[in-house]
Amino acid sequence: KNYAVNVKDVSKMVEGSYEGNEKYVFLTFDDGPSPLTEQVLDILKNENVKGTFFMLGSRLDSGQAPKESLKRAIEEGNAIANHSYSHNFKKLYPGNITDVNYFMDEFRKTNDIMRDVLGVEFDTNVLRMPGGYNSRVYYKDRNLEELDNNLESNKIVSIDWNALNGDAEGKPYTLNEMIDYVKRTSRGKNQVVLLMHDTFGKEKTVKILPEIIKYYKEEGYEFKTISDANV
């Protein structure tokens, strides 16, 4: 069974310009791998659904366990994408303006680490910018055009999200509030790209994940992954 949807189509889904009315949900996890990634993978396997992991190069570099999580995620049919190396806003966006050369270096560095783990044939051009691409638009980042040109010439597609569980919103939510947040932000959308985090301290995300999956199953969504535009 093919779970993958081309990132260019997913990009349209997030922007609301996609023409189709298929009910798709993309479970996306940022900032891993961490010890919680294994628990997330257990749940996905148990529920027989797939997800997309936007991984940090610095986390992959931090030891053998994160590399094993990366391998396992791929072996079990999930998708892997690039979330920068450092996630360090001061380096990526000094003065809240993208340092394009530095940003691109981090993207390449992270892909290289993934390749070291998964083999030379691995490549991804799927990116999620730390903070999201739309935050750059919101802050009127004056280097956005230069960044866009760089992404385009490297065939890299940046993907944000259109639903979230609130696990990175600054204020702590109860489990029920997080589940409600997912339902509220997903309502009325045929294609949902759900933002979650599988990094340290996100135990609540793991706890509610089976419930979230159940919700989308009951609502008739198919679970999909975000695939490379070059595939």
What are these regions (language model features)?
Residues 61, 65, 87-195, 199-217, ...:
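Catalytic domains of cell-wall/extracellular-matrix polysaccharide-remodeling enzymes
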Residues 1-128, 231:
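Active-site beta->alpha N-cap acidic-glycine motif
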